[in-house]
Amino acid sequence: VIRILAVIAVIAVHVTADHLDSGSTVAMHVLRSLLSTAVPAFIMISGALNLAPSAMRHGSGRFLGRRLRRLVPATLVWTAFYAGVMGILLTGEPPDWRAEIVDLLTASTYPHLYFLPLILGLTVITPVITAYVGDSGRRAWICGAVAAGWALVVMAVPPLTQGLLQEPLVPLQMGILTYFLPFIGYYVLGRAAWAAPVRRRPALVLLLVAVPALTAATVWAYLSRTTDTPPGQVLLPTYVAPTVMLLSLALVVALMGLGRRWTVTARTERFLRTVGDATFGVFLVHFAILVGLRELGYPEVSVLTVTGLLVLVTLGAFAVSLLGKKVPGLRAIL
């Protein structure tokens, strides 16, 4: 369920991105803050599933073979589609090949494609992490916390040093080979939150106290001029900033703790599993549908029409993904 909600939230982020700025209402920034947890939640759910010992029951070779047979073709095809078709052919402008290559190497060809090298990197190191963590919830919590703390420190160095040195110190250059590194903490903590979930009372405290407080802090970070320039930019909400990271962890850990014992009927479980399995394809195709509707002149003049756009893109993306999974050629890239 969290995976389904997360991908819908990702779509909402991209639909509303052009309608949010510093002049937006506080309510819109509250929504923006909550939506910022979508990608971290998706990564945590992936970690909860992939780092389970049962995922390696046939060996790491089988695990990697199965995952990479899906991820590598999808990465190649969708990068070519968005960078080539959407980014070059449809724009009608002569490409700057040097800029295109730089965008490919830095995973910035399209707003959502960074996720592909990110999840590829996490998949490749999964057997190593699983070998250490095993079925120990305690090890998962410790390993995940260390990795998350490392990410916060490393990503904070550039804004903190920009005003002190002639040039900011950048210890980690984000690119297709390194994008996954700051997200290892989310990945492992997703496993920790499932293998050793917090008890009901702490989970309620997280959900009812920590999440609202951290949401308020994230809204402040969006609106405050403190985050416009270094060193205050260290608090600017990104997936690896203290505000969003703590909010994402509090929300997902609380939901996993509270929802661990929820049960549904077998029919509902089959439905949710089918829809959940389609979320990767939804993530990949939704941006093309969004751009297509905007190119056709879909009006975005009110909250109602923007909400309608969100519904259309979501339904369209799920339809394409679910139907595509029944077509042999498309199944491999969705």
What are the functions of these language-model segments?
Residues 1-53, 71-79, 109, 181:
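Functionally critical transmembrane alpha-helices in membrane proteins and complexes, commonly lining
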Residues 86-90, 98-164, 173-195:
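Hydrophobic alpha-helical segments with transmembrane-like composition
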Residues 259-272, 287-334:
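C-terminal "closing" transmembrane helix and its immediate cytosolic amphipathic cap
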